[in-house]
Amino acid sequence: MSSLEQFVQVVIDSPSPYTNLDRIYVHNRILGLVGEDQPVEATDEQVTSLVDALVKTAVQNGKIEDAQSDRSILADQLMDLVTPLPSILNQRFWDKYQVSPKAATDYFFNLSKTNDYIKTRAIAKNVSFPAETDFGELEITINLSKPEKDPKAIAAARNQPQDGYPLCQLCMQNEGYLGRLGYPSRSNHRIIRMTLGGETWGFQYSPYAYFNEHSIFLDQIHRPMVINRQTFTNLLEIVKQLPHYFVGSNADLPIVGGSMLSHEHYQGGRHVFPMMKAPIARTIDLGVAGVEAGIVKWPMSTIRLVGSDVVALTDAAVKIHDAWMNYSDESVDVRAFTDGTRHHTTTPIAYKDGENYVLDVVLRDNQTSAEFPDGIFHPHQDVQHIKKENIGLIEVMGRAILPARLKTELVEVEKYLLGQTNQMAEMHQAWADQLKATNSITAENVTAVVNAAVGNVFARVLADAGVFKWDDAGEAAFARFISAIN
């Protein structure tokens, strides 16, 4: 059986709308996309391998250019054939939800992997390892999954007319969008509709997941990120609807926020992050009945709220957030405003712990200064050889997303430490010399030494981003802020 015939069978056997009666129609649809000549056969019977073969057939038949953008657009068009229509998918999701929330997300997650919306082959390239630090075990990842941008595609995209559709990559307008030069294909993309605060929101998976079942919850309306009472209410409502998931929001300011501030959205999934395991350093009283509160033993300044009453938890979170928005303490460089510009916000995270809800509220400050032009509470210059990008939600919780360059750069650091010929980047020199001076390095332990050191740098990165440091001055300043809340 040819790759084309095998894929036709996959389409008919899939949860798509097609049945055996549609076989000839589906066959001809695919022929129209890939061409009738020069068939390429798949290396195995995996759906992704069949699609790869069909895309190669299309290239050989001149149906598409042999360019990353064209190949991706066609692959997703083919995968769309094995994907239910949005209306059918939503109905099936909520039918399965009646069995259990987990049954519903399992169905949607597995479908999103099968139709290659979640790029499992690319994600498998990522490097990850644990690292023991003073704040417990952190999670280190080197992100290799996102495709490098093709210089030709970038140049061609510059000459494409910008029609502003879709408005951004998070908009619901992306569902089923064909894609174009410089804009990702989304033919096989599906969004579950859900209600939050009386409004329609979307739930989808992230194509290049950073952790298990990495999800995005997005506002139906294209409007900027904001942290307010409704944010806390929405996060707790999502956890109520999907109790096996955590969910959090990036901060709504540059430097301390994520990379997408233009569209209101949250991120969640099925993963227990290091911060969620971190203990309470000391309990505090916020004067909200039914809410236990405490300062978390964590490098970033975090207040944990625990309780079964979501309204009381929301009240407590708003109390913290509103106090922080206007709080300054010159003794520790904390300033809510400079020249009328706001600097304060929070990064909130919600999850279940048994019957209780937990809301972790992380204090953020995005000031810059002459000494720290990238941010006073941002990775400082001496750790930027490992991480210089913004510290967003996922990293706040203890999972490092480090740049792809480190995969090769750290190999060169290891060679340097072993006295071998190397091409180590100059920016790693001081760090590598310090490792050399403080460790007895052998061929057997060099990788473990470097990995542990990367973990300690990431702990320092988080400490740099923390507004109240774990020293006498910082702890006293944190105590003053707690008093100010009340």
Swiss-Prot record:
A biological process term (GO) from this entry: galactose metabolic process
Cellular localization per UniProt: Cytoplasm
MF terms in GO: UDP-glucose:hexose-1-phosphate uridylyltransferase activity
Entry EC number(s): 2.7.7.12
UniProt-recorded name of the protein: Galactose-1-phosphate uridylyltransferase
Organism listed in the record: Pediococcus pentosaceus (strain ATCC 25745 / CCUG 21536 / LMG 10740 / 183-1w)
Reactions the enzyme catalyzes: alpha-D-galactose 1-phosphate + UDP-alpha-D-glucose = alpha-D-glucose 1-phosphate + UDP-alpha-D-galactose
Pathway: Carbohydrate metabolism; galactose metabolism
GO cellular component: cytoplasm
HAMAP family reported for this sequence: GalP_UDP_trans
Record family assignment: Belongs to the galactose-1-phosphate uridylyltransferase type 2 family.
Keywords: Carbohydrate metabolism, Cytoplasm, Galactose metabolism, Nucleotidyltransferase, Transferase
